[in-house]
UniProtKB/Swiss-Prot annotation:
Residues 646-682 form the EGF-like domain. The gene is BCAN. Residues 157-252, 257-354 form the Link domain. It comes from the Eukaryota. The lineage of its organism: Eukaryota, Metazoa, Chordata, Craniata, Vertebrata. Residues 454-478 have a biased composition (Acidic residues). One of its GO terms (biological process) is central nervous system development. Residues 391-641 are annotated as: Disordered. This is Brevican core protein. It comes from Homo sapiens. Disulfide bonds join 57-137, 179-250, 203-224, 277-352, 301-322, 650-661, 655-670, 672-681, 688-699, 716-808, 784-800, 815-858, 844-871. SMART domains: CCP, CLECT, EGF, IG, IGv, LINK.
Length: 911
């Protein structure tokens, strides 16, 4: 028994020996230590932006303190600042000698030292956002030393605010009311200056509390010189007439409650969002509350409604798919001039706010790499992580290369351009850098460029679900995603929104059509490889009977058929032409392969070239040649398929003006672009305006006047055009050989760094980069593309503020305003002209129910499809129970409405 007990006792003694030894050592250490340093107060210590804060640090001597003799006998005091794993000295003092870091000059002091050797508290004034971090107080006296540390959090955020309707819309009194309405206060000059010192930059003039108008600029440039020319600083217009109109700088600080993201399975309209929050004992959050929550650590990669009708989302930990390179509150604007909030019927998540007696904790920053859907959790937790300002390299001069960028008036959207702050005006922020205004990203806070989003307003008739086959919603609402005033450049393409392309099954009325090559756009998230090519049988023509077709809603601002240049092995190439642009046969080295064929609309002739022709070449197989429905009497004006004598193959192509050669048993067919006709597509049916050059279904006009990229795009849009987009090698050669100059083209990556898009929304189907291009690295400012004519027209990315010549391009065929209906209206803002294949959607007026297809398409003949929509009164619920309506008044009333409202050509809806 003793043999078992002794080992157990020894084990217990050994187990407790380390703890006892530690107590002894600690006691010895405490006895040997001459003093101890302690920072009083609960962590984190909180200060306010632009204010002052004293960090209390005291020395507690465990032995009698030394007598005050000479300076050499004084303790050495050192304050350091730790942030992001880096440590920087704030000041070092010994007696009356004090050394202060240049970054803290005139802002820090030891108010009690050396008069008191036990009080080494640090006074910090003019607090900035990047003053948040860990401060360590270290005291050394002789061979003894001790230290303590505390976290400091600077509260408060300054942000620019504007109404969604217009830019520069506030008088001084209106500016004060606007900030109060969104749960904030109008900022003071001291707060704006502190934000500027923290890296904030905004090239927009805004009201401050002292009735002055100012704006902060880190990197001076032409559009943002103000009263300081080429020097950085806060531009000041001085005291301004209170009736003048500007934006306003607001300040948000405390969040006295819980702010959480509402993420229901079904996205919400604005009214539904308000009801959603009320059902949970909360109210829809204000813009100021969201900024305060973001400043406290709220991070959600999901746009949500706010009380003022804006849609925003906060990013603390940015990533390439959520917020780009810098943190901030991102905002979705409707127009590229940063105005217009999303339509109230659009569907998003919602940010709710639940009031409480004490300031609430902020939801823990979510991981942006996670699924945004997981952000719907309403758990509120305390964030212990400190929000730090992102510092950019001071020596970086690429920021200046962004230069002055002016607002682009979007004539078709009714949006007007804006002038520079001196007028006053604005320069774009970074992306998301503002597409119409260039803004150099400041160290920490910067505006991101606008990113174009395509989203259709989704409307669904509840009664229609019960009585008719349910129609899926088509997304067709053009939203420009522009970040908010504190956003940062460079978000990834996958901005957190609903997929921009969703398939919808739509009924199509019979119509004659002429064949067009192409492939329908793929839904978002589906790769080409996942859809094998379809091989069609012998040439057949679809009978003109009603049938269902699949219509996808792609992300460009207008619905266009996505087509790509393809090359068959050893055979001819089919070159698709988006929006009526050029196409021509021939091979293109390195061009993408033809998209797999998809189901064609009614009126489509499905053709397949023979697998081998007489010359042994293999023709493309499984090519779906899609026809677009038109009125029978208009088929000639939109081009067509003509049969010419068989020549063995289509090389060289006998077709002119970009016509596509198709081989059939009965001969060779020429598929003509819109605006051309004849057997060989050699007859012009439409012509460009005087001064414009026609080429393969498009019109071009070159301007030798040198402008920045934004100014050039603005000028093109004034003509209803865009900077030239290039879809084929033939179009590249035409532009480069005809207009032999360095010139802008419409390609740019200002929306998302590295994701190049055409300004007219045409898919990027062809590239002609110079070797080593594009070479723009993050935040370098090389976001626009130039064609170098003497180098075979190869492309290079350069800063957008270069002044170069440019070429504008518009479709040869376009549609005017859509037909007006007495009981329905079109979604979106009207435009001067609509490209071919643009799809618009009608909606019935309030109180009426929709019947039949609500979509119309701009046809290749420049005419809109005849509207099929019918609007009828909603059926009262009790009409379903005849016994409750013995006199049949509901039925008679419904019959009179039908007779009055339904067009004679429209089919009568079933009961």
């Amino acid at each position: 028994m003793a043999q078992l007990f002794l080992p157990l006792l020894a084990a217990l003694v050994l187990a407790q020996a380390p703890a006892a030894l530690a107590d002894v050592l600690e006691g010895d250490s405490s006895e040997d230590r001459a003093f101890r340093v302690r920072i009083a107060g609960d962590a984190p210590l909180q200060g306010v932006l632009g204010g002052a804060l004293t960090i209390p640090c005291h020395v507690h001597y465990l032995r009698p303190p030394p007598s005050r003799r000479a300076v050499l006998g004084s303790p050495r005091v050192k304050w350091t600042f730790l942030s992001r794993g880096r440590e920087a000295e704030v000041l070092v003092a010994r007696g009356v000698r004090v050394k202060v870091n240049e970054a803290y000059r005139f802002r820090v002091a030891l108010p009690a030292y050396p008069a008191s050797l036990t009080d080494v508290s640090l006074a910090l004034s003019e607090l900035r956002p990047n003053d948040s971090g860990i401060y360590r107080c270290e005291v050394q006296h002789g061979i003894d030393d001790s230290s303590d540390a505390v976290e400091v959090k600077v509260k408060g955020v300054v942000f620019l605010y504007r109404e969604g309707s217009a830019r520069y819309a506030f008088s001084f009194s209106g500016a004060q009311e606007a900030c109060a309405r969104i749960g904030a206060h109008i900022a003071t000059p001291e707060q704006l200056y502190a934000a500027y010192l923290g890296g904030y930059e905004q090239c927009d003039a805004g009201w401050l509390s002292d009735q002055t108008v100012r704006y902060p600029i880190q990197t001076p440039r032409e559009a943002c010189y103000g009263d300081m020319d080429g020097f950085p600083g806060v531009r000041n217009y001085g005291v301004v007439d209170p009736d003048d109109l500007y934006d306003v700088y607001c300040y948000a600080e405390d969040l006295n409650g819980e702010l959480f993201l509402g993420d229901p399975p079904e996205k919400l309209t604005l009214e539904e969002a308000r009801a959603y929050c009320q059902e949970r004992g909360a109210e829809i959050a204000t813009t100021g509350q969201l900024y305060a929550a973001w400043d406290g650590g709220l991070d959600h990669c999901s746009p949500g409604w706010l009380a003022d009708g804006s849609v925003r989302y906060p990013i603390v930990t940015p990533s390439q798919r959520c917020g780009g390179g810098l943190p901030g509150v991102k905002t979705l604007f409707l127009f590229p001039n940063q105005t217009g909030f999303p339509n109230k019927h659009s569907r998003f998540n919602v940010y709710c706010f639940r009031d409480s007696a004490q300031p609430s904790a902020i939801p823990e920053a979510s991981n942006p790499a996670s699924n945004p859907a997981s952000d719907g959790l309403e758990a509120i937790v305390t964030v212990t992580e400190t929000l730090e300002e992102l510092q950019l390299p001071q020596e970086a001069t690429e920021s200046e290369s962004r230069g002055a960028i002016y607002s682009i008036p979007i004539m078709e959207d009714g949006g007007g351009g804006s002038s520079t702050p001196e007028d006053p005006a604005e320069a774009p922020r970074t992306l998301l850098e503002f597409e119409t205004q260039s803004m150099v990203p400041p160290t920490g806070f910067s505006e991101e460029e606008g990113k174009a989003l395509e989203e259709e307003e989704k409307y669904e008739d509840e009664e229609e679900k019960e009585e008719e086959e349910e129609e899926e919603e088509v997304e067709d609402e053009a939203l420009w995603a522009w970040p908010s005033e504190l956003s940062s450049p460079g978000p990834e393409a996958s901005l957190p929104t609903e997929p921009a392309a969703q398939e919808e099954s739509l009924s199509q009325a019979p119509a004659r059509a002429v064949l067009q090559p192409g492939a329908s756009p793929l839904p978002d998230g589906e790769s080409e490889a996942s859809r094998p090519p379809r091989v069609h049988g012998p040439p057949t023509e679809t009978l003109p009977t009603p049938r269902e077709r699949n219509l996808a809603s792609p992300s460009p601002s207008t619905l266009v058929e996505a087509r790509e240049v393809g090359e068959a092995t050893g055979g001819p190439e089919l070159s698709g032409v988006p929006r009526g642009e050029s196409e021509e046969t021939g091979s293109s080295e390195g061009a993408p392969s033809l998209l797999p064929a998809t189901r064609a609309p009614e009126g489509t002739r499905e053709l397949e070239a023979p697998s081998e022709d007489n010359s042994g070449r293999t023709a493309p197989a499984g090519t779906s040649v899609q026809a677009q429905p038109v009125l029978p009497t208009d088929s000639a004006s939109r081009g067509g398929v003509a049969v010419v004598p068989a020549s063995g193959d289509c090389v060289p192509s006998p077709c002119h003006n970009g016509g596509t050669c198709l081989e059939e048993e009965e001969g060779v067919r020429c598929l003509c672009l819109p605006g051309y006709g004849g057997d060989l597509c050699d007859v012009g049916l439409r012509f460009c305006n005087p001064g414009w050059d026609a080429f393969q279904g498009a019109c071009y006009k070159h301007f030798s006047t040198r402008r920045s990229w934004e100014e050039a795009e603005t000028q093109c849009r004034m003509y209803g055009a865009h900077l030239a987009s290039i879809s084929t090698p033939e179009e590249q050669d035409f532009i480069n050989n005809r207009y032999r100059e360095y010139q802008w083209i419409g390609l740019n990556d200002r929306t998302i760094e590295g994701d190049f898009l055409w300004s007219d929304g045409v898919p990027l189907l062809y590239e002609n980069w110079n070797p080593g291009q594009p070479d723009s690295y993050f935040l370098s400012g090389e976001n626009c593309v130039v064609m170098v004519w003497h180098d075979q027209g190869q492309w290079s990315d350069v800063p957008c503020n270069y002044h170069l010549s440019y070429t504008c391009k518009m479709g040869l065929v376009s549609c005017g305003p859509p037909p007006e209906l007495p009981l329905a209206q079109v979604f979106g803002r009207p435009r001067l002209r609509y490209e071919v294949d643009t799809v618009l959607r009608y909606r019935c007026r309030e109180g009426l129910a929709q019947r039949n297809l609500p979509l119309i398409r701009c046809q290749e003949n420049g005419r809109w499809e005849a509207p099929q929509i019918s609007c009828v009164p909603r059926r009262p619920a009790r009409a379903l129970h005849p016994e409750e309506d013995p006199e049949g008044r509901q039925g008679r009333l419904l019959g009179r409405w039908k007779a009055l409202l339904i067009p004679p050509s429209s089919p009568m809806p079933g009961p």
